[in-house]
């Protein structure tokens, strides 16, 4: 046994544990309504998945990274060898560059690290392909953008003489990056913008004996495989000749709609690269079989309902196919997912076809239509959570408003309020889905005057001691549900009133109830979809304020937001936006008599806004534009509460993808910043090393949180122990290696290295 003094700054650097500015993801359990424990509940949901392999923890085993085009966010999933399951690992988000629209994971320089081929349209500002080269620096993965020393940092090809242009690709498409000719370097297959033929951009690095860290492309074939796609639908016509491009009846169609995906893959074991094609107009994928050679592809057969009618892909819409070894059996499996933002299946939307055959005779069999997503909270699209205690048992529950589930052949959304009850205890929350359609709110989303994007908040508007419900929605008005249960009783609401007092913020209301002017009456602060203009049509703000002009028992609001004390320019704060779209979502917290305003926005940033107290008609100040460096993707929403009784506020987040995240903030409940000090006391860990059973001994007589982390900060266990000086843990199932034992009180922190043998 040895005593370890805690802890020097170099220790934090050594183990790369993110602290301070990056908020820590909270490990909270969630159960389905059938009592199934979700394995990755707080992964944030998935709408438009693109899936690739990447060895995230450098253990020699490829993991999975999902890029969701809806929100432009990466979702890292570590493969655990012992369980053969994937575990959400959000700490790895920090290593990747900002990706937009699409990404393909391929190792072009064969150094064992996957590089990133991605869309340049919304980064470089040109329709092209950018490449991020992965490398290791001090055992840390870093990326650098590949540069051909042209005007833009994108891939170019020569057009004659000294001229060259970028390899063009529409930002809505998805190319294939693959060694199609079998010469040992990666080529590119894509539809050029406006063209109904696939172009082969051949990589000539091997042919020209260039170094392996180089990329060089030429056009090898502007009708790869000799097939063409209809410009009107997903129909594909094959050529009867190996050296002649197919054509439709005269007049020949040579243009097409934007929206196609291409995957070069081995489908039948003949060593020739076949294709899987997805199209904007198709709810399935089409397989094209190569009857030519690798250097002269000729697609001679097609299967329009791949892999067979019985288990064919049927997902709306615009599908992408991704070949990865999901189960690590050495065979390439296929995952299929929709890639059309906003108008595609947004639940149970990743089909997994396992290769049950051999490398020389692939056979793809459907395993599930909800790969990864079945283990997440995924409520469709557009989640907006609110902490509350609906059953008044002293535990913090979660009510989530949603934009809704996609409904085929309809412009409607099946939007809901979804209730998760806290069935844990004061120190260890545990949530269970208890009502997937709380108060039957989906009724309002399915009619001719459809409402969706519900945004709930609570407060005692009528002064009777219980908490009423105000719900924002896509049209910018509000539903009001009066709670008639009485104080400290299970919520019971009257029939919703809509529109509540004719109040409107024009679109996507996101209300918060707070007595902002301190007159004893709850006012309404609301976010909105669009930044606002004043009565002179000058840009002025991102939040609306409706002051309560009624009485304690009878609230009254004037719908005229230009009429003081109302305003559509609250605080004169303009949140950064995209084409005026800001999607603000305010949360006002009273820190010992001083208000702070927190808000999400369209870019997935959390703003902290100060100078609010006693300044309703004045200018607020944004004091933190990217609080916590939270990475949940676009349209982040939030709610704050201390859900584990440790004196520190926790934050639940929603996003455009319909999932949830939970974080520990840096704010104590009194508003002071949680500047955690290093523990001055001594901690004993024994035995160390050990096979998985160890004891933690310390001298504190106060609640202590003990967490077990790996060296990159992933949490394996976290418990709170009250008034203790000894604690024993059993972690026999952990893999051998170095772990960190994190010991934390309300204002003190220690990290101790523990070796599992």
Indicate where each model-derived feature is located:
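C-terminal outer-membrane/trafficking sorting elements
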Residues: 6, 677-686, 690-757
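Beta-propeller-forming repeat regions
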Residues: 20-673
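Local alpha-helix boundary/kink/capping signal
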Residues: 11, 517, 693-695
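Detector for intrinsically disordered, low-structure N-terminal pre-sequences
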Residues: 2, 6, 128-130, 524, ...
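Bacterial Sec-dependent N-terminal signal peptides
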Residues: 1-24, 673, 740, 749-757
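A generic structural signal for short, non-catalytic loop/turn and secondary-structure boundary residues
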Residues: 2, 329, 393, 678-679
């Amino acid at each position: 046994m040895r005593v370890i003094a805690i802890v020097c700054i170099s220790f934090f650097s050594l183990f790369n544990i993110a602290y301070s500015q990056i908020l820590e993801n909270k490990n909270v359990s969630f159960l389905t309504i059938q009592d199934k424990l979700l394995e990755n509940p707080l992964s944030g949901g998935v709408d438009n998945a693109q899936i690739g392999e990447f060895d995230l923890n450098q253990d020699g085993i490829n993991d999975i990274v999902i890029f969701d085009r809806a929100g432009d966010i990466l979702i890292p999933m570590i493969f655990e060898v012992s369980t053969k399951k994937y575990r959400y690992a959000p700490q790895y988000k920090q290593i990747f560059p900002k990706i937009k629209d699409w990404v393909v994971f391929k190792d072009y320089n064969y150094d064992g690290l996957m590089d990133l081929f991605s869309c340049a349209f919304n980064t470089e500002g040109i329709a092209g392909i950018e490449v991020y080269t992965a490398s290791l620096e001090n055992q840390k993965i870093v990326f650098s953008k590949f540069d051909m020393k042209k005007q833009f940092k994108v891939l170019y090809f020569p057009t004659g003489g000294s001229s060259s242009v970028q390899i063009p690709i529409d930002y809505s498409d998805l190319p294939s990056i693959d060694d199609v000719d079998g010469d040992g370097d990666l080529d590119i297959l894509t539809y050029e913008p406006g063209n109904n033929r696939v172009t082969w951009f051949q990589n000539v690095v091997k042919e020209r004996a260039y170094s392996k860290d180089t990329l060089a492309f030429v056009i090898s074939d502007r009708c790869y495989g000799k097939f063409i796609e209809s410009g009107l639908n997903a129909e594909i016509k094959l050529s009867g000749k190996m050296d002649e491009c197919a054509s439709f009846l005269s007049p020949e169609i040579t243009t097409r709609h934007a929206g196609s995906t291409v995957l070069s893959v081995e489908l039948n074991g003949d060593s020739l690269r076949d294709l899987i094609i997805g199209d904007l107009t198709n709810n399935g994928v089409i397989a094209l079989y190569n009857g030519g050679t690798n250097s002269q592809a000729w697609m001679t057969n097609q299967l329009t309902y791949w892999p067979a009618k019985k288990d064919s892909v049927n997902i709306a819409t615009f599908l992408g196919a991704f070949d990865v070894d999901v189960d690590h059996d050495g065979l390439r499996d296929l995952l299929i997912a929709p890639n059309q933002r906003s108008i595609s299946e947004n639940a149970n939307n990743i089909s997994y076809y396992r290769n049950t055959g051999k490398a020389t005779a692939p056979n793809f069999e459907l395993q599930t239509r909800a790969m990864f997503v079945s283990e997440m909270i995924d409520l469709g699209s557009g989640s907006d959570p609110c902490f509350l205690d609906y059953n008044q048992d002293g535990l913090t529950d979660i009510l989530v408003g949603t934009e809704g589930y996609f409904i085929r052949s309809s412009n409607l959304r099946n939007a809901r309020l979804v209730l998760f009850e806290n069935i844990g205890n004061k120190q260890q929350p545990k949530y269970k889905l208890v009502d997937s359609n709380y108060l039957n709110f989906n009724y309002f989303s399915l009619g001719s005057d459809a409402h969706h994007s519900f945004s709930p908040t609570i407060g005692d508007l009528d002064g009777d001691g219980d908490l009423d419900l105000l719900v924002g929605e896509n049209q910018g008005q509000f539903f009001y549900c009066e709670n008639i249960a009485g104080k400290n009783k299970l919520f019971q609401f009257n029939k919703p009133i809509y529109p509540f007092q004719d109040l409107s913020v024009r679109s996507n209301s996101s209300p918060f109830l707070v007595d902002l002017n301190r007159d004893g009456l709850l006012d309404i602060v609301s976010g909105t979809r669009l930044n606002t203009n004043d009565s002179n049509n000058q840009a002025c703000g991102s939040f609306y304020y409706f002051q309560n002009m009624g009485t304690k028992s009878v609230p009254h609001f004037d719908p005229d937001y230009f009429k003081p004390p109302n305003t559509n320019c609250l605080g004169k704060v303009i949140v950064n936006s995209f084409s005026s779209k800001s999607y603000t979502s305010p949360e006002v917290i009273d820190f010992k008599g001083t208000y702070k305003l927190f808000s999400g926005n369209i870019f997935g940033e959390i703003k902290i806004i100060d100078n609010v107290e006693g300044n309703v008609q004045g200018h607020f100040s944004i004091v933190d534009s990217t609080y916590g460096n939270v990475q949940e993707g676009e349209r982040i929403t939030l709610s704050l509460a201390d859900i584990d009784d440790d004196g520190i506020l926790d934050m639940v987040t929603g996003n455009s993808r319909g999932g949830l995240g939970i974080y520990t903030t840096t704010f104590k409940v009194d508003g002071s910043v949680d500047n955690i000090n290093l523990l001055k006391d001594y901690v004993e860990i024994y035995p160390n090393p050990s096979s998985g059973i160890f004891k933690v001994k310390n001298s504190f007589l106060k609640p202590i949180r003990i967490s077990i982390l790996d060296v990159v900060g992933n949490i394996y266990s976290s418990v709170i122990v009250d008034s203790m000086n000894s604690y024993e843990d059993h972690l026999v199932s952990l893999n051998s290696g170095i772990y960190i034992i994190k010991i934390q009180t309300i204002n003190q922190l220690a990290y101790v290295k523990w070796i599992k043998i």
